[in-house]
């Protein structure tokens, strides 16, 4: 039975990867600091929790033991993290290091954490220029996240070991934080009958389902190598299409009001607003043999059900307060009252599920 060791295995990506590997007959050890955070479904499926601190090399080496067929690092944020991973990777058949679309820059040097949004004219391939590496900035900051990821990537890619760097887009699934779909789920639960969307709901920010990441990681496990791979969903729905998907899954009907530039600033915003599409090219992963687990609609459904069930039990997402900017009902109602039934500032469609 092949063995996998997942560093940071109780989080979004680790949970999905562990479940997929367990279903495929792997022995999976999930490394984390707090056993109380071990998802119950992983334990039920046969996963084993190993208590260790990712920052403690002695503990992670003990967790690896005599080696693993697959090593997955969901917590590699800096060059120092990457260097501490190398002794583990040297005793693993295939290693996956999670990275991000945040490393990419457009022709003007802008990136997804820039004050000015980037403009990528075409889907982003793995050979697109990246930010310069940095080790002297906080990886938890907007300015430091991408440069530190680049520095970490360079360490593992130059090691000569079979390490695959996986650059994900905006991730979603059970356990995602932030759970961006809450901006729409909450609106449904509140019984809103009208949905206002800025930029006519045309914003596109490519998503990456944790289930699709897990599928790619399993593919890499059987095809070790030193490479960089993008990972994103097989479709890239717009903000309008995402809202329709969520409302449809929850059986909710509302009128859509698609706002143009004459509408008040800030009205109709969603977490997927972007003046220019941000889409990853995933043809390299496909060529390797990756087959996604599903589209956005099919992979987001379990997370939607989990959000609704938790809300009905009185449990909101931990970061629910950060979504208030998308749920300004008073401003929406005032705009609709001023509109007086006309379509000034936008146009309406019929009810959508």
Annotate each language-model stretch with its function.
Residues 216-276, 302, 311-353:
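Mid/C-terminal beta-alpha module of Rossmann-like enzyme folds, strongest
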Residues 7, 173, 197-203, 229-237, ...:
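Glycine-rich Rossmann NAD(P)(H)-binding loop
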Residues 26-34:
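Conserved glycine-rich Rossmann-like NAD(P)H-binding loop of the short-chain dehydrogenase/reductase
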Residues 35-97, 103-106:
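NAD(P)H-binding glycine-rich loop region in Rossmannoid oxidoreductase-like domains
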Residues 150-175:
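Conserved beta-loop-beta element that borders a ligand/cofactor-binding pocket
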Residues 4-24:
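N-terminal Rossmann NAD(P)H-binding glycine-rich loop of SDR-like oxidoreductase domains
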Residues 179-184, 197-221:
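Substrate-positioning beta->alpha
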Residues 83-148, 164:
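Conserved Rossmann-fold NAD(P)-dependent oxidoreductase catalytic core, especially the SDR/UDP-sugar
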């Amino acid at each position: 039975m092949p063995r996998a060791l997942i560093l940071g295995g109780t989080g979004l990506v680790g949970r999905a990867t562990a479940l997929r590997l367990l279903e495929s007959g792997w022995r999976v050890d999930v490394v984390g600091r707090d056993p109380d955070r071990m998802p119950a479904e992983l334990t039920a499926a046969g996963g084993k929790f190993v208590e260790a601190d990712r920052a403690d090399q002695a503990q992670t080496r003990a967790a690896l033991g005599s080696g693993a067929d697959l090593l997955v690092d969901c917590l590699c944020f800096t060059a120092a993290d990457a260097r501490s991973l190398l002794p583990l990777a040297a005793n693993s058949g295939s290693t996956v290091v999670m990275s991000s679309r945040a490393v990419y820059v457009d022709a003007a040097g802008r990136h997804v954490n820039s004050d000015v949004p980037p403009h990528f004219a075409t889907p982003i391939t793995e050979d697109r220029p990246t930010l310069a590496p940095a080790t002297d900035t906080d990886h938890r900051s907007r300015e430091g996240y991408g440069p530190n990821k680049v520095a970490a990537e360079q360490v593992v890619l130059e090691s000569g070991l079979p390490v695959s760097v996986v650059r994900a887009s905006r991730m979603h699934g059970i356990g995602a934080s932030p759970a961006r779909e809450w901006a729409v789920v909450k609106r449904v639960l509140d019984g809103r009958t009208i949905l206002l969307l800025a930029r006519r709901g045309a914003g596109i920010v490519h998503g990456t389902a944790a289930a699709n990441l897990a599928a790619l990681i399993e593919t890499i496990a059987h095809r070790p190598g030193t490479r960089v791979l993008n990972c994103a969903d097989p479709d890239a729905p717009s903000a309008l299409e995402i809202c329709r998907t969520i409302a449809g899954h929850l059986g909710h009907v509302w009128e859509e009001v698609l706002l143009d530039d004459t509408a008040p600033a800030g009205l109709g915003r969603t977490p997927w607003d972007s003046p220019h599409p941000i889409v990853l090219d995933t043809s390299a992963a496909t060529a390797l043999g990756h087959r996604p687990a599903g589209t956005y609609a099919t992979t987001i459904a379990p997370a939607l059900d989990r959000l609704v069930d938790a809300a009905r039990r009185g449990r909101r997402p931990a970061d629910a307060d950060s979504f208030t900017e998308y749920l300004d009902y008073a401003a929406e109602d005032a705009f609709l009252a001023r509109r007086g039934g006309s379509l000034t500032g936008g146009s309406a469609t019929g009810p959508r599920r």
